[in-house]
Amino acid sequence: MNNKNDIENKCLERGVRLTDQRKLIAKVMSESGDHPDVDELHQRVNKFDSKISIATVYRTVKLFEEAGVVAKHDFKGTKSRYEKA
């Protein structure tokens, strides 16, 4: 498996349809060395494509979570953070 974009690979294995925007979000998440929240992820994705909205990032992260390719972590008093599952 290509570690550079293992989220994309897992999506393909699970039959998740990947648009160009979803591929970019998967790439940014896969290459992340930390556990970003959606706002941080949106800022990083916007460096590559400023047309991707925060709503698109939220929907995509939720889709990835439901497909079991990312894990959501809730910490008391902070925003949810995400990592590769």
Language-model features: where?
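Non-DNA-binding regulatory cores of transcription-related proteins
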Residues: E66-A85
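DNA-recognition alpha helix
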Residues: D39-S50
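Short capping segments at the starts of secondary-structure elements
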Residues: E31-D37
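Basic amphipathic alpha-helical segments that dock to polyanions
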Residues: V57-A67
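Pre-recognition alpha-helix immediately N-terminal to the DNA-recognition helix
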Residues: K23-V28
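Short helix-coil-helix linker/hinge
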Residues: L18-D20
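Short, Lys/Arg-enriched N-terminal segment that forms or immediately precedes the first helix
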Residues: M1-G15
